[in-house]
Curated annotation (Swiss-Prot):
This is Beta-mammal toxin Cv2. It comes from Centruroides villegasi (Scorpion). Residues 1-66 form the LCN-type CS-alpha/beta domain. Has the structural arrangement of an alpha-helix connected to antiparallel beta-sheets by disulfide bonds (CS-alpha/beta). One of its GO terms (cellular component) is extracellular region. Is susceptible to be slightly neutralized by human antibodies scFvs 10FG2. One of its GO terms (molecular function) is sodium channel inhibitor activity. Expressed by the venom gland. Disulfide bonds join 12-65, 16-41, 25-46, 29-48. It comes from the Eukaryota. One of its GO terms (biological process) is defense response.
Length: 66
């Protein structure tokens, strides 16, 4: 599974500005989804890879980013 890492309290994606390989995104993906996860910056959001099937990613149901 893949997807954008999401802030559970705001419903927003984690923003990033350095597209492609991004240490911040990689670190945040591993913190939230485990050491097997990968991550990079795609379309100014942190995109996480190698997630378990039940991983919660953006968008959250009934929670818009505000």
């Amino acid at each position: 599974k893949e997807g954008y890492i999401v802030n559970h309290s705001t419903g927003c994606k984690y923003e990033c500005y350095k597209l492609g390989d991004n240490d911040y995104c990689l670190r945040e993906c591993k913190l939230q989804y485990g050491k097997g996860a990968g991550g990079y910056c795609y379309a100014f959001g942190c995109w996480c890879t190698h997630l378990y099937e039940q991983a919660v990613v953006w968008p959250l149901p009934k929670k818009t980013c505000n």
